[in-house]
Amino acid sequence: AKYRDLTGEEGCASWPQGVYLARDAFKGMGAATALDLVQERVIGGFPVAVKPAHGGSALGVHKVDSVDDLGEAILDALSFDEAVVIEQWVEGVEMAVSVLGTGWDAYALPPVEIVPMKGLYGTEARMEPGAVQYFAPVRPASLSDDEGDAQAIRAEIERAALEVYRAYNARDLARIDLIWDGAQARVFEVNVSPGMAERSLFPAACAAAGLSLSSVLNELVSQYAK
């Protein structure tokens, strides 16, 4: 799906091509047919990402390099949810863009760049101190060798996050997870309940914007206490 598919307008955000597969459908059509369907629908071939349709902390998320490992990855992802999403694997600069506000008053906080020290940004890496480096805001050199171009790309990334946020009618706060692939922002998750722990991405974005997490949350609470 693209932003314009949701709103009828042209946008700069896109989603990787993918397949939604429910557990009942997987059982009903059989593993062999389901695997054939996935290979037919996911444009670009392997590698693909397999993940639960709902969840967090990368539980049940797999990078699958060949059809031989696809069935096992789907079964594992289905152990965390009633459905899975299989989509193109996208390489690039991984970021999280937090958004505050509602409607046209919403605004993006500085993108947080995510750099695993080794392997993927999976469950273990998220929980292990020192396994991931976070840069808030994203380093200009990660986007372009030219500083001016890097600033323009960052602005486009923030605009893409806002487009998605508004297209989904999100309100108050959310975190848009995406990858900059060198040409566009490829969105792979909209998290309307982002983590608030000390090492979480949303507090890092607040700090990069010069905001304290407590002041942001107090402001949100006060809006609904009036």
Label each residue range with its predicted role.
Residues 146-226:
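ATP-dependent carboxylate activation and anion-phosphoryl transfer catalytic cores
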Residues 45-47, 94-96, 175, 187:
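Broad gene-expression machinery/nucleic-acid interaction feature
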Residues 62-152, 156-159, 180, 186:
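Phosphate-binding site of ATP-dependent enzymes
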Residues 20, 26-28, 96, 184, ...:
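Short Asp/Glu-rich motifs
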Residues 58, 134-135, 197-202:
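Short small-residue beta-strand/loop micro-motif enriched in glycine and branched aliphatics
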Residues 21-24, 55, 114-117, 129, ...:
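Active-site/binding-pocket entry motifs
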Residues 1-92:
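Active-site nucleotide/adenylate-binding loops and adjacent lid/helix of ATP-dependent enzymes
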